Amino acid sequence: NPDCLLPIKTGPCKGSFPRYAYDSSEDKCVEFIYGGCQANANNFETIEECEAACL
């Protein structure tokens, strides 16, 4: 899935939402804090969604 290779993007907004993204350097899904706007497609609400899409 090419979306999984996109960089992990917090975005410019000031929210604090736990999300998951695929980290290609670690070959796994990792948690990060999402600000709430301007996400890219490498942004999943659960680790299960991330793993289903990217692993």
UniProtKB/Swiss-Prot annotation:
Keyword Nucleotide-binding assigned: no
Stretches assigned to coiled coil: none
Record-linked Gene3D superfamilies: Pancreatic trypsin inhibitor Kunitz domain
Chain segments annotated as transmembrane: none
Gene Ontology terms, MF aspect: serine-type endopeptidase inhibitor activity
Tissue specificity annotation: Expressed exclusively in the middle silk gland.
Reactive bond for trypsin (site feature) positions: K14, G15
Disulfide pattern: C4-C54, C13-C37, C29-C50
Additional remarks: Has an isoelectric point of 4.3.
Stored PANTHER family: BPTI_KUNITZ INHIBITOR DOMAIN-CONTAINING PROTEIN, KUNITZ-TYPE PROTEASE INHIBITOR-RELATED
Subunit details: Monomer.
Functional summary from the UniProt entry: This cocoon shell-associated protein inhibits trypsin Activity by forming a low-dissociation complex with trypsin. May play an important part in regulating proteolytic activity in the silk gland or protecting silk proteins from degradation during histolysis.
Protein name according to UniProt: Trypsin inhibitor
Originating organism: Bombyx mori
Organism classification: Eukaryota, Metazoa, Ecdysozoa, Arthropoda, Hexapoda
